[in-house]
């Protein structure tokens, strides 16, 4: 049988954790090859010593089939798992083009609701799945990725509730590598459910320049949050995500459970003057609203203000 080639593009916390478990599981399997695409000092360390993966179940040193910044060394991929930041998606797609063949599946695992559509536009005719993950993992230093928190969910599927043999087979490949993977027929519901929290809270912690907890202690801030979530419900359901209005209470409950002073990654990036995911987490809602003919006045106001920063 032909070898199955799984390529992990982006070896930060998310890519490093899932890629590391895949490399660990299939190191001695002659039929499955695992490739890491990374760059810089991190790549050099992995090429020299392998990837060190620190998890709640122990610390492992894993070695992929190949770690490289030159995808032409890989050949045509069967599965490509992409984990860049949303603002790097277009350049990352351009990077992987040489390894995309007629039967390649591309699976983005990054924040946002428009990633798969963006990839399909850039790679016409390619089978693009959809996914999202719940995980706390980070790149500690070059060559070392650490996960914490005990949650590592890897959710994926194909749009319009499609099922095929490859989806089922891929779920098995992941589970055999001790990855908490679930194939969902209605993956849109899963992705949108996560997006309700990350989009609204990232946008508003940045807009108001406050912590998660402070979003709920002021009536104006809380009302703005509810308004954004109401706009999202209309858009998500127009897209077929089947979201109930109870999502508003769920987001508020999630915020209440978090330490008061914690904040979103996007807010931290704004404060540090770094590139942010404001388009993927805020602007994409405005664009989708325009496309669907659904007004998003709260999102539009927040997005326009954030663009000035």
Where are these regions (language model features)?
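Active-site-proximal catalytic alpha-helix in oxidoreductases
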Residues: 188-216, 220-233, 259-260
């Amino acid at each position: 049988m032909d070898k199955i080639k799984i390529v992990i593009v982006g070896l930060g916390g998310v890519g490093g954790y899932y890629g590391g478990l895949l490399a660990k599981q299939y190191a001695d399997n002659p039929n499955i090859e695992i490739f890491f695409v990374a760059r810089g000092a991190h790549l050099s360390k992995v090429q020299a010593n392998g990837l060190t993966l620190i998890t709640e179940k122990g610390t492992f040193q894993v070695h992929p089939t190949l770690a490289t910044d030159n995808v032409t060394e890989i050949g045509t991929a069967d599965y490509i798992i992409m984990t860049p930041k949303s603002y790097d998606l277009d350049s990352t797609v351009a990077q992987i083009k040489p390894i995309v063949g007629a039967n390649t599946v591309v699976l983005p695992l990054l924040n946002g609701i428009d990633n798969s559509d963006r990839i399909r536009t850039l790679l016409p005719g390619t089978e693009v799945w959809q996914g999202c993950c719940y995980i706390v993992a980070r790149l500690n230093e070059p060559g070392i990725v650490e996960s914490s928190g005990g949650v590592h969910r890897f959710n994926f599927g194909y749009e319009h509730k499609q099922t095929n043999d490859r989806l089922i087979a891929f779920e098995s490949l992941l589970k055999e590598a001790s990855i908490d993977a679930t194939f969902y027929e209605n993956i849109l519901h899963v992705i949108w459910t996560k997006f309700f929290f990350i989009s609204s809270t990232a946008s508003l912690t940045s807009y108001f320049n406050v912590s998660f907890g402070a979003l709920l202690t002021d009536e104006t801030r809380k009302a703005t949050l509810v308004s954004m979530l109401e706009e999202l419900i209309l858009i998500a359901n127009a897209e077929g995500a089947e979201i109930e209005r109870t999502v508003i209470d769920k987001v508020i409950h999630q915020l209440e459970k978090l330490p008061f002073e914690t904040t979103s990654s996007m807010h931290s990036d704004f404060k540090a003057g770094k590139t942010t995911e404001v388009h993927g987490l805020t602007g994409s809602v405005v664009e989708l609203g325009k496309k669907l003919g659904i007004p998003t006045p709260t999102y539009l106001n927040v997005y326009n203000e954030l663009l000035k920063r």
